Amino acid sequence: GSGLHINLSLCMDGRNLFEGDIAPDSIAGSFMAGVLAHSRELTVFTNPLPNSYQRFGCDEAPRYVSWSRQNRSQLVRIPQVKGNNCRMELRSPDPACNPYLAVGLVLAAGLDGIEHRMVLQAPINKNLFDPTEAAGLGLERLPSTLEEAVQAAQESEFLHRVLPEELSHRYYEEELKRCAALKAAADSAEYERVHYFNAI
């Protein structure tokens, strides 16, 4: 499937905070740490269709919660470290997401990282599309199904804080209905083509 990568820059006093080396306890480092820490529970919002999860781990879509500078197998990468275009790139979202919810929650996750002074983990400079390179690293994985993503969100203390209860309850309910409808379909591929192809 297609990706809808979210690119974000942080600026303070006219300076791009993603420029140059990113210290683990810097503002930019804490922002990225927050995004990574909350990435599993955000997945139901960035990847809202059952088919979204077929993409993870192939076609340059991430599977693990990790970051690096130029490595496209990571969840977060830093594509540029010099000039005005310095930024972080979140590579998991897809075009089916509601951009207002997805971007808003990614920003909230990053700000939570800053507020709680989260420390950025070390970068992973391996090709995580290769199972032999990923093995033994002990990396947390993104949800592998929409049902798993809903469960991660429902159990999230962070999302309980930042989302209205009525909104989140209705959203999770609709996502689980999607899962049930697909399972009940006689031909799941045809069901997805009819219901989702034009949307994505």
Predicted regions mapped to residue ranges:
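Histidine-centered divalent-metal-coordination microenvironment in nucleic-acid enzymes
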Residues: G1-D13
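Catalytic-core signal marking the mid-to-C-terminal active-site face
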Residues: C11-I200
